[in-house]
Amino acid sequence: REAGIAWTNAPGCNSASVAQYVQSALLLLQQLKGVQLSELTLGIIGVGNVGSKIAQVGQELGMRVLKNDLPRQDKEGESDFSSLQALAAECDILTFHVPLYKEGSYKTFHLADHTFFRSLKRCPVIINTSRGEVIETNALLNALEDGLISDAIIDVWENEPDINLTLLNRVFLGTPHI
């Protein structure tokens, strides 16, 4: 203000673009990997502006959709949410759409760590378009190498712009934080 520069906050302004990115990635999986999306369960971690649109995309593609959003569940008390453990057990694709919180009761920093990946039951595809630090890079790379997940679609990277090139060369789709 002192410098005469105006600014504004525009939460959710890119949510449609992120939803289009995820939809395109899902369709690319279907085309190149031969998966039938309508037979899969999509788990959405973080159901705000972006996650809500992803839920709609999943439903339009005929997918079963499970949603996880602990802050919203605590605030709204909705029974429409599933636990992270339920998503780990039931989902074929897990997509992250959470803000980055390094501390607190809703901490998302390294939410997907070695323990998380070892809890997965269905060898899912992992999608991250939220914040790079939500997924621990070494844990993701180990999960790929150990067959705990079948593939990864990554648009946001831990330590951007100095990303892990081994991980970049291992993912199904890697993009530069579009």
Q: What do the predicted segments below correspond to?
A:
Residues 1-35:
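Phosphate/diphosphate ligand-binding glycine-rich loop within oxidoreductases
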Residues 3-5, 63, 122-124, 147-151, ...:
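A short helix->loop->beta-strand "cap" motif at the edges of active sites that frequently abuts
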Residues 11-15, 71, 87, 156-158, ...:
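Short, acidic/turn-prone active-site loops that include or flank metal/cofactor-
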Residues 17, 53, 135-138:
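Residues that form or flank phosphate/diphosphate-binding pockets in enzymes
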Residues 25-62:
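Glycine-rich NAD(P)-binding loop of Rossmann-like domains
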Residues 65-69:
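Short beta-strand "acidic-cap" motif of Rossmann-like dinucleotide-binding folds
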Residues 73-165:
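Rossmann-like adenosine-cofactor binding region
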Residues 166-178:
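Short FAD-binding loop at a beta-strand-to-alpha-helix junction that anchors the flavin cofactor
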